[in-house]
């Protein structure tokens, strides 16, 4: 995982982590990235580490080989997109804003709040495309995500679960971010797909994560490590998994040293 795991709270990979990743790969250890981010942004992070690996993006909805070839894509089914776009999410909290990913394009409905614009500058992210909901409803969507206060998103979560009737993934990746994506898509399924191509068993893999979108991945690999800064639902759901340090303590890299160097 990237945000809250490999990346620091400043959304960068530390020099120590870069060094360790390259060292384990030099020893022949396979290393993969599995994130909720889109491909283009994930590729930039991969390049900052100085490696070329297959990328699992949009929470397992898309997998690209290291030569950029799209290996598979599982967008949200069209029948759900209209239902989601018809939800009056603002009734749960005026601060909530709706985002969507169309391929590698980040879309925001309405306008981007000032607080979010400040974060864009802090994290050096590109400005999203602004698009009305009725136009978003006509597109092929990799995932939706809502940003807002946690207590308000909890109310929205209940409505989304009712609307989807359990046929979509509705998960918190962090307290202030609620994501919606194809039920068949998760990081574990995407990892299994990549490992099968490499002739590797899931039981031979280790993984690191902090959000509930990491749940299946951490549960199904041989050893799943929960970050010390993990979202409370993830920690509660995986009480037997080892908890390591935080993303600002290079906890993943330190565990990789312990395991492989």
Regions flagged by a language model, labelled:
Residues 6, 31-34, 55, 180, ...:
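Conserved SAM-binding loop
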